[in-house]
Amino acid sequence: MKQLTILGSTGSIGCSTLDVVRHNPEHFRVVALVAGKNVTRMVEQCLEFSPRYAVMDDEASAKLLKTMLQQQGSRTEVLSGQQAACDMAALEDVDQVMAAIVGAAGLLPTLAAIRAGKTILLANKESLVTCGRLFMDAVKQSKAQLLPVDSEHNAIFQSLPQPIQHNLGYADLEQNGVVSILLTGSGGPFRETPLRDLATMTPDQACRHPNWSMGRKISVDSATMMNKGLEYIEARWLFNASASQMEVLIHPQSVIHSMVRYQDGSVLAQLGEPDMRTPIAHTMAWPNRVNSGVKPLDFCKLSALTFAAPDYDRYPCLKLAMEAFEQGQAATTALNAANEITVAAFLAQQIRFTDIAALNLSVLEKMDMREPQCVDDVLSVDANAREVARKEVMRLAS
């Protein structure tokens, strides 16, 4: 029986994780749930899964949760704040920590889990985008095991040989017969939109993803392919891959989730329905397998699988991310922070779709790119980039 802390339990990854627990009550027990401000959903989760602890981001939400749980006779202990979240990630009897808090808020709790030597089911993109070197160093020191949840990285992980799986971030790809990693992406809803029309695309149009169901911010990142750019950065860290060992491919059907090319000419791929419960269940049960609740892939119903190289004129954010990796962690952190601000501005209809990439570049050009030495340095770069991005948005929107 694996004991689990879920960081970000009320978000889409958190809910999918709990669904895997629901399908496998004999394999997993929820010890702690950590969330932001969604009290209603947290109440439902606490009543169904009876965790020992529930943590809300702020005191007001925690107070409300406590009252509501007491009314229902729940014995779950309610806490609040970042330190409590970090404590839950490092609890002695917890085996696995699902790191699914979105954004910079997820950094310290994820790092706490790494330092405690846990098995970390990594769904928080920002961890490696902003703290790749710091986190991978901590993984090595504490002998923690990282298991990637993101569907693409999970597909790559499943397609890699065991020596690499057990030494993630440090194993030599070439020594293990790997030539390159093929990262696939759907290309988003504007894959075939004429370039001249991109400026007029609306938030609602950007959020209509053809294959995956996901939140609005990530949907926009899919439309700009910034999500693939961030995944590229993550993959470089996770799999110890050089630029020449990475290939990015557009694959509109999202059936092949990513591939690994080997020296002998073999290419191994992981296929499946586009449902996050598959990679989540894989990481939770690794090295075994459990029922994820996902319906089997029906090959007879598949249309043709197609592939194309990404067009950087259509997806300038992808190119920005690839270039930022070469500049270092200050650049990747600044890009990620700027992108959160610009995407929020686009969703609020303050700027146009094409302004997202232009403003992200503008922020990078204005930042001091000294390499961060600790999480506080990273958070400082993050805060500065957000400030610069806000000013850029205001300049453009006024």
From Swiss-Prot:
Pathway: Isoprenoid biosynthesis; isopentenyl diphosphate biosynthesis via DXP pathway; isopentenyl diphosphate from 1-deoxy-D-xylulose 5-phosphate: step 1/6. Divalent cation. Prefers Mg(2+), Mn(2+) or Co(2+). Gene3D superfamilies: 1.10.1740.10, NAD(P)-binding Rossmann-like Domain. 1-deoxy-D-xylulose 5-phosphate binds at K125, S151, E152, S186, H209, S222, N227, K228, E231. The keyword Ribosomal protein does not apply. NADPH binds at T10, G11, S12, I13, G36, K37, N38, N124, E126, G215. Mn(2+) binds at D150, E152, E231. Disulfide bonds: none annotated. Optimum pH is 7.0-8.5. InterPro entries: DXP_reductoisomerase (IPR003821), DXP_reductoisomerase_C (IPR013644), DXP_reductoisomerase_N (IPR013512), DXPR_C (IPR026877), DXPR_C_sf (IPR036169), NAD(P)-bd_dom_sf (IPR036291). It catalyses: 2-C-methyl-D-erythritol 4-phosphate + NADP(+) = 1-deoxy-D-xylulose 5-phosphate + NADPH + H(+). Homodimer. Catalyzes the NADPH-dependent rearrangement and reduction of 1-deoxy-D-xylulose-5-phosphate (DXP) to 2-C-methyl-D-erythritol 4-phosphate (MEP). This is 1-deoxy-D-xylulose 5-phosphate reductoisomerase. It comes from Escherichia coli (strain K12).
